[in-house]
């Protein structure tokens, strides 16, 4: 949407000015967050709950590990490490919450959560465990076979998926401009 270039432009300008971005997440409607260095950040129109989590992690001198904002900004997640403990915070569907709680009850530490507005998801744990919705099962399997352990994930509402792995980046159904950069 051409009317949204200004907010995204503000965030990309911030990245260029700082000459770094450790993690970034953008929505289709202009919501965005860029994490730099040890947790410096720029944001535009973040949901208050997500902003509160970012501020709390910084106050506790934690480190933000992973962020996700869905394409329309309805759902979000922040994975952080505070006092050497991995913590997730999210606004997500009940199905995704149930998966996150089930993994935690098994002693799994979540390091990445990617989701869309339709409850499709990829959850990555530090021990290599992956939970995902059926839509991404084949993609996850192919990525692991080709590039090894999955370290982080990103998904789109249109079934697109990017998986960062030990030995490379695997992607499916993403715009060619994004694929060219990867």
Predicted regions and their residues:
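Short beta-strand motif characteristic of blades in beta-propeller domains
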Residues: 1, 25-39, 66, 71-84, ...
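Repeated scaffold domains used in trafficking and secretory/extracellular systems
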Residues: 19-24, 62-71, 100-101, 108-118, ...
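Trp- and S/T/G-rich repeat-edge/linker motifs of beta-rich repeat architectures
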Residues: 1-19, 41-63, 85-108, 129-149, ...
């Amino acid at each position: 949407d051409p009317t949204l270039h200004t907010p995204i432009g503000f965030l990309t300008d911030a990245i260029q000015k700082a000459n770094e971005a450790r993690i970034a997440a953008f929505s289709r409607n202009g919501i965005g967050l860029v994490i730099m260095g040890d947790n410096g950040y720029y944001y535009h129109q973040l949901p208050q709950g997500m902003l509160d989590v970012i501020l709390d992690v910084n106050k506790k001198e934690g480190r933000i590990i992973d962020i996700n904002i869905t394409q329309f900004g309805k759902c979000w997640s922040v994975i952080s490490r505070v006092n050497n403990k991995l913590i997730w915070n999210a606004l997500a569907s009940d199905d995704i919450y149930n998966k996150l709680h089930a993994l935690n009850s098994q002693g799994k530490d979540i390091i990445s959560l990617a989701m869309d507005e339709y409850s499709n998801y990829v959850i990555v744990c530090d021990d290599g465990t992956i939970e995902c919705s059926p839509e991404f099962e084949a993609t996850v399997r192919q990525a692991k076979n080709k590039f090894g352990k999955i370290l982080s994930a990103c998904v789109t509402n249109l079934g697109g998926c990017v998986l960062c792995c030990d030995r490379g980046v695997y992607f499916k159904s993403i715009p060619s401009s994004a694929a060219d950069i990867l």
